[in-house]
Amino acid sequence: MLDFYADWCISCKEMESYTLSNPEVKQALADFVLLQVDITKNNADDKAFLKAFNLIGPPAILFFNLNQQEQTDARVIGFQGTKTFLKHLSKL
């Protein structure tokens, strides 16, 4: 699971505070490896990273299979509440 976030991103803070910190979500993510991409600086490297994944900005969560291939249909773009995110995870 690759989580794109920025300190200035309000939706990222909401996702962290309300959704990703929820005990049910934490349990559902127990078997996932979480990597985070901090694009707070929004510099050339950050923009290149976003472009490489065809993203316009955070928040965005990407999921990969065991062969390190992105599951593009599983992308989460923008804020999702706990129930919606748990439902999404159940389909992976």
Model-predicted regions and their roles:
Residues 1-9:
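Short active-site neighborhood of thiol/selenol oxidoreductases, capturing the structured segment around
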Residues 1-2, 34, 61:
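Hydrophobic beta-strand anchors of alpha/beta hydrolase catalytic cores
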Residues 11-30:
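Typically the conserved alpha-helix immediately C-terminal to a functionally engaged Cys/Sec
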Residues 13-14, 47, 73-75:
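Short, solvent-exposed loop/turn and secondary-structure capping segments
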Residues 19-24, 56-92:
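Non-catalytic, surface beta->alpha helical segment in thiol-disulfide oxidoreductase systems
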Residues 30-35, 58:
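Loop/turn elements at helix/coil->beta-strand transitions in domains of secreted/extracellular proteins
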Residues 44-58:
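Structural alpha/beta surface segment adjacent to cysteine/selenocysteine redox centers
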